[in-house]
């Protein structure tokens, strides 16, 4: 009789402990980690993306009206440098090192609007205006892909930045 009680007690204890062990199982994290990582300096962003990100130099067209807001790496390969102007418009400048046969790659993040080809200097640049009025451009130079997106920005300011600063810099330094 004593053996039956020991056996019953052992079965009961096991039944009580099984849910305890099962509840300690680790649950996998839900969702995916963000591919966006912010950096504090240009050099940290360049190192993280193994590239030389295109940027808006101080003292150019919008001197004193343009403020750097973010250095962001996207997926560890694409840099996104963001600016805010005094008038509330914003500018995003992206750079990615091309791998293999990625020439002509659109890294702007803009996939609506009608893209048109135009020559700026010796570079073919694809430009578009979206339904919300944002202006976008992308092009490649050497082993790099570039894009610039302006939101709430006049066509004249965007075009001047694109031709006089960004495409010009990419033709001379990349």
Language-model features: locations:
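Noncatalytic linker/hinge segments flanking ATPase motor cores
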Residues: 135-137, 167-168
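Surface-exposed amphipathic alpha-helical segments
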Residues: 142-144, 148-174
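Sec-dependent N-terminal signal peptides of Gram-positive bacterial secreted proteins and lipoproteins
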Residues: 1-24
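Short, solvent-exposed recognition patches
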Residues: 26-135, 141
């Amino acid at each position: 009789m004593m053996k039956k009680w020991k056996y019953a007690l052992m079965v009961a204890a096991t039944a009580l402990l099984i849910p305890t062990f099962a509840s300690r199982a680790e649950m996998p994290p839900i969702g995916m980690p963000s591919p966006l990582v912010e950096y504090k300096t240009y050099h940290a962003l360049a190192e993280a993306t193994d590239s030389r990100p295109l940027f808006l130099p101080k003292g150019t067209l919008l001197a004193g009206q343009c403020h750097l807001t973010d250095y962001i790496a996207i997926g560890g390969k694409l840099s996104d440098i963001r600016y805010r102007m005094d008038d509330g418009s914003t500018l995003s400048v992206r750079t990615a090192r091309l791998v293999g046969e990625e020439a002509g790659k659109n890294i702007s993040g803009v996939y609506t609007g009608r893209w048109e080809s135009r020559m700026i200097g010796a570079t073919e640049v694809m430009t578009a205006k979206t339904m919300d009025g944002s202006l976008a451009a992308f092009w490649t130079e050497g082993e790099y892909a570039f894009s610039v997106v302006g939101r709430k920005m006049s066509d004249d300011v965007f075009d001047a930045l694109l031709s006089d600063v960004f495409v010009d810099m990419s033709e001379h330094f990349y």
